[in-house]
Amino acid sequence: LEVFKYLPGTNTGDCGEATCMAFAARLIERSRDINECPHLLKDEFKEKYIELSKLLAPEIREVKIGVGDKAVTIGGEDVMYRHKLTFFNPTAYAFDVWDTMAESELIERVNKIQNFKKFYVGTFLTLDMIAIRSTSSNPDQFANTVKKVSETTDLPLILCSFNPDVLRSGLEIVGDKNPLIYAATKDNWIAVKDLALEYKVPVTLFSPMDLDTLKSLALTFQEFGIKDLVLDPGTYPSGSQLKSTFDNFIKLRRAGIEEDQKDIAFPIMATPITAWMIHEDPVSASYWETVVSSIFTVRYGDIMILHSIEPYALLPELHLRDNIYTDPRKPVSVDAGVNAIGNPDGESPVFVTANFALTYYTVESDLSSNSIDSYLVVVDTDGIGVESAVAGGQLNAKKIKETLDKFDFDVKEKTSHGTIVLPGLAARLQGDVEDETGLRVMVGPKDSGGIPKWMEKNWPPK
């Protein structure tokens, strides 16, 4: 109701919702944007628009880095714990290059970063950003590296140096691409502040193990009108200092969300790359970098700078991030239907599964990778896996028949065998499905990875 009173109340449906009350509900759950209401954009509603924007603003400020389709948004969180609502903007992973690399190595590494992708539960997991580090402290050399990187990729950039002259040389090349500059400290803040104002880019504030100074920097930058800030309280990758780092992240996030300290309610940066400063062995360094990045993906790291691009480091980081930023309010599901896997014909098997995304893509992958031409009947189980759906009644004989009817799939007409194959975990439905559909029903393996061996013994049906 608090949100509703700022809406026009005309119920025109121009926003895509039937009523303003429905639109208000969508605004609260952050599935719609106030700019989708054309009436709010009129001058007569200007004051209400401003007040509503303040009311709906997330507890942690959102900061946009980059431009175009590849731009990333960090922050924007409203809760300390995901189960209370959800987390909205996944941790942005930036991988480093440096200005003393040979040109061929630089371009090769940039391409590896921007081209990496891993298919996982219906989507591709990718890397988000590139952090360009100045190891030469030479403005011209840094500018040359920034130029080469920007010509090779359109991923958002972080320009990394404590030397304002070096940062300026990079901004002269890519200042119009909204990079994040790293970093302002208690020693260089005046010059970095001037750069942020001149180029209108977001800036990281760095104060290791000193939250009071970090807050002071944040207040100072805000007084100059700079709102797009990222906080780096320092990342120490081992021992008691790792615990202190962990505590500082929690203190910052709690201050922003639960204590309403808006002057420090900004995205937090972690730098797991620091593991490479204390471990000489590359495998150990990569291992601890992955450990640290995992810790702060779970606990309030909105953006990270990392080094390891080996699959053994990337996969756990990306899989963890994807799971942490899954919306617990919505089952991870796929559309119901009857899907052709490969090039099925009248002799091909007809498998049944649930529409829980992880189940579906596992089954689909097992069928595709083993070149099993088949039909896959996907039943709407409210995004619940097979075993739980059978127990809860979301997967039953009636629903299987309804799915076949809805998608006009006549098994007897499409196939010569008139048979469907249930998952092993749905074996108890066999008799009911036979009675409901009039089809022959077989029970497959409990795990779709066992389908090839099951096929050898049981297909075609005798």
Where are these regions (language model features)?
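Conserved mixed alpha/beta catalytic, RNA-binding, or beta-rich assembly cores of soluble enzyme
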Residues: 29, 81, 92-221, 227-425, ...
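Non-heme iron-sulfur electron-transfer modules
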Residues: 25-55
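N-terminal amphipathic alpha-helix/helix-capping segment at the start of soluble metabolic enzymes
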Residues: 1-9, 45-110, 336-344
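Alpha/beta catalytic cores of nucleotide-metabolism and tRNA/nucleoside-modifying enzymes
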Residues: 1-6, 34, 38, 44, ...
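Local cysteine-cluster metal-coordination motifs and their immediate loop/turn environment
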Residues: 8-26, 35-39
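C-terminal amphipathic alpha-helical "assembly" element
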Residues: 436-438
